[in-house]
């Protein structure tokens, strides 16, 4: 009977995830909270633990990134990236994903990659290279950048005391593993993609669309050049302010002894890494707005802030529903599943893979 009830609960959870995915945006969070309501009030499961630190890190990093966008810093970085990529157009399949990866590695969020994708597509098209080659790798590279980013919520969650932090694994360890691993993975993926499909000059379908005016490469190139020519004299200062925040996070992550210490109840405690990221990135946002002379309203209305807040609401509902389901049925999973996962650890990675597909998120 217990197994049937848990399977029924799992069906409800998966159904609500699917509905949220179809609705999109904050629908993830909304339908996730519907799941929490059903599990708590319908099945009397205790509410799970909210990922407060992850949510607050997303808020702080997205606020800093949105301030950077409002100050023109993001456009400045995109312009610099475009200049670099245009100097190496025939290597766009390799350099496009690597630049995207570097953007997300520094920014701590994949939402900053949106501005790069049209440029990568245009440069690939003008070089007669199938845009799908660099774009398919670039979208994956954005997520890989998050895994090794010192300011991403994913990294902070990994090194928290609930996960690897309890095993004395810190920011330095995660970066030493994830950065080289993701870099090599991108190179391998780009090498494979370099042989996918025909070049555009040999593709009859592409040539047909150009002849019929469905695709106009010259017009697309002109639009990109106009967008890249827009400059803001304060943008460079905003970029340096953002990079200063990232550098401070890396410094405090690599050298925990530099973080402030407090005596609470006769015990010495060190400022945690999630709190360090939250404080520094919010302070960086203030500095960016100051030196970049940005309008706060523009930061809130920007694409980065909107996408980031959607992600936070989604995590609010989905993560709470997932933790409520698993923690509420923990004895069952420990009895029936823990042994299998212990014997075959790769099954956990497979489960994460399919859940990420359903959630459209890492």
Task: Go through the PLM ranges and name each one.
Residues 160-164, 260-269, 334-340:
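Membrane-interfacial helical/loop segments at transmembrane boundaries in membrane proteins
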Residues 69, 195, 199, 255, ...:
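Juxtamembrane transmembrane-helix termini
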Residues 9-12, 98, 174, 280-283, ...:
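Transmembrane alpha-helical segments of multi-pass small-molecule transport proteins
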Residues 1-65, 205-325:
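Hydrophobic transmembrane alpha-helices of multi-pass small-molecule transporters
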Residues 121-217, 223-238:
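Membrane-core helix-loop-helix motifs of multi-pass transport proteins
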Residues 19-21, 31-34, 40-41, 45-129, ...:
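Membrane-embedded alpha-helical segments and adjacent helix-loop junctions characteristic
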Residues 16, 100-103, 145, 181-189, ...:
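Alpha-helical transmembrane segments of multipass membrane proteins
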């Amino acid at each position: 009977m217990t197994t049937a009830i848990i399977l029924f609960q799992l069906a409800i959870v998966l159904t609500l995830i699917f509905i949220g995915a179809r609705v999109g945006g904050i629908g993830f969070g909304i339908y996730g909270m519907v799941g929490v309501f059903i599990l708590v009030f319908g099945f009397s499961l205790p509410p799970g633990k909210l990922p407060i630190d992850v949510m607050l890190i997303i808020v702080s990093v997205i606020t800093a990134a949105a301030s950077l966008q409002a100050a023109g810093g993001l456009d400045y970085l995109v312009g610099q990236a475009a200049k670099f990529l245009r100097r190496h157009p025939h290597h766009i399949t390799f350099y496009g994903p690597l630049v995207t990866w570097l953007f997300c590695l520094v920014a701590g969020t994949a939402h900053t990659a949106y501005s790069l994708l049209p440029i990568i597509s245009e440069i690939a098209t003008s070089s007669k290279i199938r845009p799908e080659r660099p774009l398919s790798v670039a979208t994956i590279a954005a997520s890989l950048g998050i895994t090794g980013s010192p300011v991403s919520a994913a990294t902070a969650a990994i090194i928290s005391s609930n996960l690897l932090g309890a095993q004395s694994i810190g920011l330095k360890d995660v970066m030493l593993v994830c950065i080289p691993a993701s870099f090599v993975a991108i190179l391998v993926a780009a090498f494979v993609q370099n042989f996918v499909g025909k070049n555009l000059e040999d593709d009859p379908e592409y040539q047909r669309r150009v002849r019929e005016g469905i695709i106009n490469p010259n017009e697309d190139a002109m639009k990109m050049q106009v967008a890249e020519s827009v400059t803001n004299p304060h943008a460079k200062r905003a970029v340096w302010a953002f990079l200063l925040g990232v550098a401070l996070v890396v410094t405090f992550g690599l050298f925990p002894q530099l973080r402030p210490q407090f005596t609470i109840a006769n015990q010495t405690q060190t400022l945690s890494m999630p709190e360090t990221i939250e404080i520094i990135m919010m302070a960086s946002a203030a500095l960016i707005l100051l030196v970049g002379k940005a309008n706060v309203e523009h930061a809130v209305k920007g694409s980065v802030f909107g996408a980031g807040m959607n992600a936070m609401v989604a995590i609010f509902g989905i993560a709470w529903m997932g933790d409520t389901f698993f923690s509420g049925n923990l004895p069952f999973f420990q009895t029936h599943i823990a042994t299998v996962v212990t014997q075959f650890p790769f099954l956990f990675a497979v489960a994460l893979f399919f859940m990420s597909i359903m959630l459209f998120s890492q």
